[in-house]
Structures are given as C-alpha cells and as structure tokens.
Amino acid sequence: MDEARARDVLTAAGLDGGEPAELLALGENAVFAAGDLVVKVGREAALLERAERELAVAAWLADAGVRAVRAAEPAARLVDGHPLTVWHRLPDAVRPAGPEDLAALLRHLHALPAPPFTLPARDLLGGVERWLRLAGEAVDPADAAYLRARRDAYAGEVAGLTPHLAPGAIHGDALPRNVHVSPDGPVLVDLETVSYDLREHDLVVMALSRDRYGLPAAAYEAFTRAYGWDVRGWDGCAVLRGARETASCAWVAQHAPANPKALAEFRRRVASLRDGDPEVRWHAF
C-alpha cells in the first residue's frame, strides 16, 4: 500500500475533508492527520482484527487511568479491503519524549491487572512471513530463507524462557517514538501491539536501541533508573534481543520493493546478523 492508495481509502471513507490530510507515517499503516482526527489505514484486510483489538485496548486504558491515545470512533471500519480506525488528534507535542517518559508509562501499564478481554501473546515473530511475502522478489531469496530459519529457531527459544518479572499486559513496541508529550504530560500511542506476555519484551526494546540504533548510554541508564530494573541482567535477554532483531530486519523487507534505501538497509541488517556482529548500527531509511 502506497500513499496514493491510502488516500483513496480516506476518500472512500469520507474522511478526506476540505484540506488535504497530512501523512504522518507510512508502514503497515498509513497514518493521516485530518482536522482534529487521526486516521489509521491498515495495509490489508487481515489486519482488521488487530485494529479492533487496538480500539478495545484504548478503551480499557482509559478506564484504568493510563494516559493513552483515545479513539474517536468505537469500531473499526473495513474500507475497500483496508481496516480503518479514527482517533482523537493530540495537541502538538511540547517536547520530544525521553526515556524517562516511556519508563513511567510502562510502570503504570505493567502494574495493571489483566483486562476484561483476551489479549494475545506477543507474537514478535508472527509478522516475519507477511513482511517477506510483501517484499517478493525485491530481496535475495537466500536472505529471506535465512530469516525464516532464524525465526523458527528463536520461536522455540522464546517459548522456553523463564521470566524475571510477572507476565502481564505489555505495550509490545515500547520506544520513545510511541510516546507523545502533550501539554498535560506524556501519552502512550500506537497500541496495536499491546499483548499479554513477558514484561521483559517491553524492556529489551530499549536495550536493543542502545546497541543497534545509537541510543546514548546515559539515555538508556535514565530509562532503567526510571523503570527500576535493567533487563540486561536477565538470562533471557539475549534470546529476546535476537528474536526482535530478526523481526526488525524482516519488517524492513516489506518496504524494499518501492524504496531503494530500505533495500540497502535490509541487506545491511541481514549481513550483520549473518556475521554475528552485535555492534553494527542499524538506521532508519
């Protein structure tokens, strides 16, 4: 799904309004700002269930007093084969979100009891096949086969982990980019990966950011201080990190057919995994 296709879906849904909607992000979802609303258009119909669950999560967090994005419509729509959800637009951010902002929201989320509906386990590796399928012939078949084999190996290892923290609700993609600092304080956004699983999933993300994406050591230390624990001291950290690296690498593949920079970054990531080099920096594209 490219931007033009996503805009066609907006038009079909009657949400393009008078002013052209502003594209905020384009990945598995196209995210648009349309007046005082934010509209998320999913890549394919198979993501409808996830969109519906994200709305249920938002309502649950509102009831629990967690500062998180709020839905403007209670149900997801399916428009021309694409799931679509509508959200209240947040005020402009007063500053970039920091590690401490994320840690505080995670502490609140991780303290909650289970919601009154079933959350899935964090299927960290579940998107690998879909992303590689979307990549098609743009990526080397040997690289795709390598990632599939790596996925299968890590799936078994993750299933056998013994957690340090009590399992429960997690965000699933816990990064500062998924926190919006509004005038009233930090707000958790992008709730589609909220799951019920090892709390360590949410903490390994920042550890990987330190090692792969250039997060300064001081920023990572601020995160662990604010949360109260450093996941790197846990025996299972390397396994969760390896699984997330596999997923993060495959995620880039879906963008390779239309984006030469994404293809170059995909190749870079695969090479670093093949070489077993944990210090090669990964980049946005």
Show the residue positions of the predicted features.
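Short pocket-lining segment of the protein kinase catalytic domain that shapes the ATP-binding cleft
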Residues: 84-92
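Conserved NTP-binding catalytic cores of kinases and kinase-like/nucleotidyltransferase enzymes
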Residues: 1-69, 183, 283
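Active-site acidic catalytic loop and adjacent metal/ATP-binding pocket
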Residues: 25-39, 71, 155-203
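A cross-family kinase active-site recognition segment
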Residues: 93-145, 165-167
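A short, glycine/Asx- and small/polar-enriched loop/turn
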Residues: 28, 33-36, 79-83, 243
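ATP/Mg2+ or Mg2+-diphosphate-binding catalytic cores
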Residues: 130, 134-138, 142, 250-285
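Active-site activation/catalytic loop segments of kinase-like enzymes and analogous catalytic loops
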Residues: 200-231, 243-258
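A conserved alpha-helical element in kinase catalytic cores
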Residues: 3, 40-80, 92-111, 214
